């Protein structure tokens, strides 16, 4: 379980529980800061100490493995799980090459040290400055408040007013400092997932390509690197979307701190001073009080513990509440209550007159307060005019601008958007707007469509089903995700389901042109997740679930054909699978548990062997058994496949043998890489009987310019074995970790086809596995395949049998 979110509403209350939670965040920040320093220190030692390189790698890997991400909320997305486990994977990779001498690239410092140092100094350092300001303003406010509360009511009115203004000013400054500090510390807590991992990832990438002895390991690392980059980019997109919503919530909290109440919280809570009478006089004791209006229970927690004894909270059942007359007591802001558990009257003092009125209103006192209504943005309705507007927008977009780069991501002019909406939803002549004969551009149309959907009185996917949809997206059972969302879609009201089908069908059409507009299902999920789904309460906890809303929309886009083919056979949602005991135990993408790679030994198969292989193909070539002695080693050309050319779950075919090197390729930038990984290709690549059709060459991606020994053929079990999660072993038998004989396939994509390799005796393509039922699962399917094949045996050299 991670840290609970720090609600902005708690900044106003400044309760002991809030301070305790804030302390946990501060400890985590210090731990992260120390971790970054360790990584920087160990990375520098790795670059400078070439002679002690092996020991430096070991220390660095231990540092990475010792760190574990904490997170906000109760569940991680698949991408966040991959990021959380990434340091463990990095450490395993470094341990594999502990005994190998490697050369460090010249720009290693720029890849690792500078980004981490920048993050530590700018982000964490800025957070510490916010902390100092928060503590300083808090100390000044409470010191002034204590002096202020001891002022006699017999002072001059001008002096009292001046003191009140000063207290209000300090309270406002402290509240703003608290809001800024909470916002900053949560932002650093979330952003460190990619700001820390990305520099280490880039450093490892340069580390492995700098030495020819580690090229084989680098080839294994590439799919993981690309998949992790995809996870980082998705997490960054979710973070950007969440940050925008949290900034809006922060602004609303600044305007009206008391308007956002969390469900299940007390009616009112805050600090009160209680008058306690003793034999030697009267004293005022500070308590943190919570009042539940339904049960009329007042819980008082002392903040000043007496030495030698720890006092717990006291629960009182309220009888009545009445304001204390000003002339009857020397203190200000007082009111009296009576409780069943105590005899006599209990006198309480509030920090201000406004706060006293809030307490009396909650306790049904004699001075209720009437809040002025909060102006609310005009809401849209899901009616015939709305359907007409959505259809006209979709028709215009698909006709005029479906190939526009950054479609829906680029924002139009607010003035033009309001002008279009006011004209279309004019009560006098609704819908009387011609999109084609006007000066409306594509950005205005897309922004207007998003504005209409976001400002519906109830979101398209309804408040009622919001929690169930988010819960389905949080499940680590990939089949359950799709089944539950499929079932919940048909629980929507008729007009909501019709509108959702209209929109998702349009988004599918947009994604089919992702090569031109660069808008993949993941990108569309980030944009339309907060648009089609919205929590009923305005809280930080709800904002943290936006990333799961994005996943719901992404699944709807990727499985549109299946979901809207008809309702599921069982109208009820499938039974909820057992919840995650801890998100850390979820199996992430991994390369550290792949099969062991041995030195490659190849031979020229005889004609009989080739014929036998044709009739009995194996995933990676002919089984090495009862053959002639091995011949001279040959090297293998490893052309880099276009990311996304292989079906999810399909193993890469054996490579043709060649003595030539691959052509140099340039490293694509992150945005293009993520696009290629997510695009997956919507059109099948043409094939010919003798190899790829001219013009269907590979798109350039990051490559390694080396000659690599061809993998040694080994025995593989059936493809069906890859679907098993585990196999039963005798007690005491340890699991054997074996590396695969060939480079793992490139990261899977949405829908793609692999190019047919040239026909050669040594190359036999493997059988295709079934595509996973959830496209989200395709991101991690092939990484889990290698670790599940525990029953596969290693190949043997010809003549090794005894």
UniProtKB/Swiss-Prot annotation:
Residues 265-368 form the PH domain. It is found in: Postsynapse; Presynapse; Cell projection, Axon; Cell projection, Dendritic spine. SUPFAM superfamilies: BAR/IMD domain-like, GTPase activation domain, GAP, PH domain-like. One of its GO terms (cellular component) is terminal bouton. Residues 716-732 have a biased composition (Basic and acidic residues). GO terms for biological process: actin cytoskeleton organization; cell junction assembly; cell morphogenesis involved in neuron differentiation; cerebellar granule cell differentiation; cerebral cortex neuron differentiation; establishment of epithelial cell apical/basal polarity; maintenance of postsynaptic specialization structure; negative regulation of proteasomal protein catabolic process. GO terms for molecular function: actin binding; GTPase activator activity; ionotropic glutamate receptor binding; phospholipid binding. Residues 641-663, 682-802 are annotated as: Disordered. It comes from the Eukaryota. It holds the Pfam family PH. The record marks 409 as: Arginine finger. Residues 380-564 form the Rho-GAP domain. High expression in brain, particularly in the cerebellum, hippocampus, thalamus, frontal lobes, sensory cortex. Found in the myelin sheaths of peripheral nerves, chromaffin cells within the adrenal medulla, and in extra-adrenal chromaffin cells associated with celiac ganglia. Residues 751-768 have a biased composition (Polar residues). Keywords: Cell projection, Cytoplasm, Endocytosis, GTPase activation, Neurogenesis, Synapse. PANTHER family: OLIGOPHRENIN 1, OLIGOPHRENIN-1. Stimulates GTP hydrolysis of members of the Rho family. Its action on RHOA activity and signaling is implicated in growth and stabilization of dendritic spines, and therefore in synaptic function, in hippocampal neurons. Critical for the stabilization of AMPA receptors at postsynaptic sites. Critical for the regulation of synaptic vesicle endocytosis at pre-synaptic terminals. Required for the localization of NR1D1 to dendrites, can suppress its repressor activity and protect it from proteasomal degradation. Interacts with HOMER1. Interacts with AMPA receptor complexes. Interacts with SH3GL2 (endophilin-A1). Interacts (via C-terminus) with NR1D1. This is Oligophrenin-1. It comes from Rattus norvegicus. The gene is Ophn1.
